Amino acid sequence: MAVDNFLFGQCILYFLAFLFGFIAVVPLSENGDDFQGKCLLFTEGIWQNENMTMGKQRFIVEEWGPESSCRFITFVGIVSLILSAVQAWRTFFFLCKGHDDSLFHSFLNLLLSLLVLFVVFVAGTISSVGFSIWCDSVTENGAMPSSCEDLQDTDLELGVENSSFYDQFAIAQFGLWSAWLCWLGLTVLAFLKVYHNHRQQELLESLVQEKELLLGHPLQRSSYVYNRNAMI
């Protein structure tokens, strides 16, 4: 029953991690297309007066953020999506067949969960911090009358499609951090499963030793009686 509970919990969390990974990857891919491969994470710029008489301002990008940042978080989202899908199918198969991982495979699963947990945390942090820097830059640290969300409805004249950037990264961050919570739960379950399997193995070894001791005493007594009769 305990094994079935572990497998059922893992199956549900893997499915949720797959779902949230999908939620993160789709808007990130759309943003990459809208910005023509340019990355708005960590992008900095300033507002300048384009027309002094009319007082019209235009946002000038001083330096676009590193493309590797956007590529990394998209890659992590895809990896999380694929791994969770494979693991969900594998766990569901074990649940239906009544199989269970060995102690060694449970330990490998724990290491994999820890690795993915760390990588998704890094991706979520990059997404949150990088997008915060972009919003601070485009709103001049809150000095602009419009918020970062409102500015997506304004044509920033950057040669890119910026009509959905806030919604895209808000959804992507939600997907990444939700996926991280799922992997956190999976890591805890993987640790508990390793501990459970280790305790079971110790119990099995203890039972084997007790059986050997119980079988060994009668054999020793029979050998003693046989030797005594032979001497007589």
From Swiss-Prot:
<feature type="transmembrane region" description="Helical">
    <location>
        <begin position="114"/>
        <end position="134"/>
    </location>
</feature>
<feature type="glycosylation site" description="N-linked (GlcNAc...) asparagine">
    <location>
        <position position="162"/>
    </location>
</feature>
<feature type="glycosylation site" description="N-linked (GlcNAc...) asparagine">
    <location>
        <position position="51"/>
    </location>
</feature>
<comment type="similarity">
    <text>Belongs to the TMEM179 family.</text>
</comment>
<feature type="transmembrane region" description="Helical">
    <location>
        <begin position="75"/>
        <end position="95"/>
    </location>
</feature>
<keyword id="KW-0812">Transmembrane</keyword>
<keyword id="KW-0472">Membrane</keyword>
<feature type="transmembrane region" description="Helical">
    <location>
        <begin position="6"/>
        <end position="26"/>
    </location>
</feature>
<dbReference type="InterPro" id="IPR029673">
    <property type="entry name" value="TMEM179"/>
</dbReference>
<feature type="transmembrane region" description="Helical">
    <location>
        <begin position="169"/>
        <end position="189"/>
    </location>
</feature>
<keyword id="KW-1133">Transmembrane helix</keyword>
<keyword id="KW-0325">Glycoprotein</keyword>
<dbReference type="GO" id="GO:0016020">
    <property type="term" value="C:membrane"/>
</dbReference>
<protein>
    <recommendedName>
        <fullName>Transmembrane protein 179</fullName>
    </recommendedName>
</protein>
